[in-house]
């Protein structure tokens, strides 16, 4: 299948890019930590083909709900190669995961109570999530004056110590892991240094004996001018006390692994002139490439139908999407840019993270997804239709 024949809108996965990101991060980890691994953040992009590639390249599945836990098992992850985080664990999958030897990080009080229902004829190891307030721990990386967190147990409030005490009282449960994930706005190496120093002090005060430390995610991928995987790992190592350098180090990248591996293509379908602007309508939507509606520009290219015979636009061009929402506007080209016409293709790059996962079933259902592999371009998820939409419904 040729790229010019693809039905738009669509996503295209670069398989080689995804694998390269995983392997380069893994290589960086093992340059400092013999005991380390990547937990791929399933929520960032849960496309089954992506999950299979992550699994086949040595990643664990980092999941944050009972749905994601079941999905990870369904696509073939070893039951011991799952990191189970977040507040949306079900009791049955929580107990199953602990019993099967997955890395389960306790998030709240109800999960501690669930531990009491495990069989008493053996011992179990679990992790616990520590609350990270960026404003207090690394204020230069804070997004606001009070960059607190609703996740994990707070050491300052005493709830972390209370949680440890409750777990210890159960008798056959050991805290062997710590989860300290926060994603700073800056994604700086310095942030992770500060968090590691903060947490290491708590590990010492609470006399924890850790098998693993889950540092979470929030890293840049391979981008010019941004920290590299190696710089992050060097920062981890330098901040860790020597007494903790033999602990298994876990990272949970999502964006850093999958963002650069996806493009999104959409086609210009109509052009109108009014109110001092040119309105360019496409068959794509901002919902697919910027679901938080925060971006002001994108990594993008244009594939023009007749590039040599194209005039310049005398007015600004407003590039908009397929939906009926007025604010489905992606970006604006200034006057003097090449005038877009029907049939032109706009290609968005680095759109693999929190895009497909958050695309709504609004007006247009999920688009085609292709993979660019040594075998050529292959369809790996067919565009949804009304049959996909209504399955499971009674009407």
Placement of each model-derived feature along the sequence:
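A charged N-terminal "starter" segment
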Residues: 1-118, 122-124, 161, 168-174, ...
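Charged (often Lys/Glu-rich) extended helix/loop segments that serve as interaction or gating elements
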Residues: 2-3, 235, 248-395
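Structural beta-strand/beta-sheet cores of well-ordered domains, especially the beta-sheet scaffolds
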Residues: 9, 102, 124-126, 149, ...
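Conserved, mostly hydrophobic/aromatic
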Residues: 18, 43, 65, 97, ...
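Active-site-proximal loop/turn and secondary-structure-junction residues that shape catalytic pockets
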Residues: 44-46, 67-68, 88-90, 108-110, ...
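Solvent-exposed alpha-helices and their adjacent loops that cap or buttress functional pockets
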Residues: 76-77, 96, 119-121, 143-145, ...
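Glycine-rich, aromatic-flanked loop segments that form ligand/cofactor-binding clefts
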Residues: 121-135
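Active-site loop/helix belt of alpha/beta enzymes
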Residues: 133-271, 363
């Amino acid at each position: 299948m040729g790229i010019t024949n693809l039905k738009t809108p669509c996503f295209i996965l670069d398989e080689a890019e995804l694998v390269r990101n995983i392997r380069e991060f893994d290589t960086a980890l093992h340059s400092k930590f013999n005991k380390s691994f990547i937990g791929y953040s399933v929520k960032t992009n849960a496309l089954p083909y992506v999950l299979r590639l992550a699994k086949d390249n040595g990643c664990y599945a980092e999941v944050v709900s009972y749905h994601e836990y079941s999905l990870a098992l369904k696509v073939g992850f070893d039951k011991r190669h799952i990191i189970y985080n977040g507040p949306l664990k079900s009791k049955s999958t929580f107990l199953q995961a602990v019993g099967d030897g997955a890395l389960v990080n306790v998030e709240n009080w109800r999960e501690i109570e669930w531990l009491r229902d495990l069989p008493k004829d053996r011992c179990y190891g679990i992790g616990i999530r520590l609350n990270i307030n960026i404003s207090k721990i690394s204020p230069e990386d804070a997004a606001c004056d009070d960059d607190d967190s609703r996740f994990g147990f707070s050491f300052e409030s005493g709830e972390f110590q209370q949680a440890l005490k409750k777990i210890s009282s159960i008798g056959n449960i050991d805290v062997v892991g710590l989860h300290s994930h926060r994603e700073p706005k800056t994604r700086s190496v310095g942030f992770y240094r500060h968090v590691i120093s903060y947490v290491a002090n708590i590990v010492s005060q609470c006399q924890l004996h850790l098998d693993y430390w889950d540092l979470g995610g929030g890293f840049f991928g391979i981008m010019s001018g941004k920290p590299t995987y190696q710089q992050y790992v060097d920062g981890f190592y330098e901040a860790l006390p020597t007494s903790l350098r033999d602990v298994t180090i876990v990272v949970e990248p999502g964006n850093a692994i999958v963002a650069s591996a996806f493009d999104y293509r959409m086609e210009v379908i109509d052009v109108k002139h009014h109110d001092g602007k040119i309105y360019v309508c496409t068959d794509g939507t901002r919902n697919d490439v910027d679901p938080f509606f925060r971006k002001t520009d994108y990594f993008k290219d244009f594939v023009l139908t007749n590039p040599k015979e194209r005039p310049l636009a005398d007015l600004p061009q407003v590039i908009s999407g397929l939906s009926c929402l007025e604010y489905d506007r992606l970006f604006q080209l200034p006057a003097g840019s090449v005038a877009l016409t029907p049939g032109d293709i706009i290609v968005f790059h680095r759109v693999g993270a929190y895009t497909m996962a958050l695309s709504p079933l609004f007006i247009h259902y999920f688009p085609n997804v292709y993979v660019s592999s040594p075998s050529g371009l292959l369809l790996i998820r067919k565009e949804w239709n009304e049959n996909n939409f209504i399955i499971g419904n009674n009407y």
